[in-house]
């Protein structure tokens, strides 16, 4: 099998200094330790890792016996994760799908062929939305919220609406503050950042929106200190 195509995101964890040895927790940062502790505490049977990249957290979960679905828009990262999971016999299903397409469904078209003329292909979708197909006990949304809001212009409310449909019980989300180094130093990645100020994009706003769809929330320290792990439960 030929190697996956290369992309700038293939070395994402390495570039951030977060390509840690999964078997050596002593080198992990607060983020990795926190997520591992949450997984061990919640004990989900299934997990959806959105924006998984090459799947560090997907692999972490799969090694704990969890059935994982990992999604990303980067083909190279997903191909790499697929090969790793296959070679190491891990229960990970890597899929190329964007957050925007999580709610997409496809219907058939009318057909004039006599055999199909009386059938209504628009009565039910041929392709169910991911919000129905990929529902999992736990959903990971790490390092993604700020891209969806500040980069793509999705409303925080809409993001939670989609994530609550995907999550049967627990949502683990990483909040990234406007003062985070990557946001400050790479404004070109966040084309809608001018739409937000500190009073419209902050951790309190995110938590309050999340409480509309989840009954409880816990905050956990991440790394660096401009980031916080939010654990929502239904």
State where each predicted segment sits.
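S-adenosyl-L-methionine
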Residues: 82-133
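A conserved beta-strand element that flanks and buttresses the S-adenosyl-L-methionine
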Residues: 140
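Conserved beta-strand signature within the Rossmann-like core of class I S-adenosyl-L-methionine
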Residues: 165-177
């Amino acid at each position: 099998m030929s190697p996956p195509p290369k992309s700038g995101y293939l070395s994402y964890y390495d570039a951030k200094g977060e390509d840690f040895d999964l078997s050596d927790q002593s080198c992990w940062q607060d983020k990795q330790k926190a997520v591992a502790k949450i997984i061990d505490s919640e004990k989900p049977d299934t997990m959806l890792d959105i924006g998984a990249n090459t799947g560090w957290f997907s692999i972490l979960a799969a090694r704990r016996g969890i059935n994982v679905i990992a999604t990303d828009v980067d083909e190279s990262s997903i191909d790499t994760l697929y090969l790793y999971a296959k070679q190491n016999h891990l229960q990970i299903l890597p899929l190329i799908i964007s957050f925007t397409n999580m709610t997409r469904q496809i219907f058939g078209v009318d057909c004039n062929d006599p055999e199909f003329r009386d059938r209504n292909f628009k009565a039910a979708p041929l392709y169910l939305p991911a919000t129905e197909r990929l529902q999992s006990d736990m959903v990971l949304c790490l390092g993604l919220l700020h891209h969806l809001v500040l980069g793509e212009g999705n409303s925080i409310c809409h993001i939670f609406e989609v994530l609550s449909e995907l999550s049967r019980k627990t949502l683990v989300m990483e909040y990234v503050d406007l003062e985070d180094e990557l946001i400050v130093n790479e404004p070109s990645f966040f084309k809608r950042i001018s739409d937000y100020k500190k009073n419209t994009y902050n951790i309190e706003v995110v938590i309050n929106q999340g409480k509309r769809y989840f009954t409880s929330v816990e905050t956990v320290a991440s790394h660096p200190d401009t980031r916080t792990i939010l654990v929502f439960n239904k």
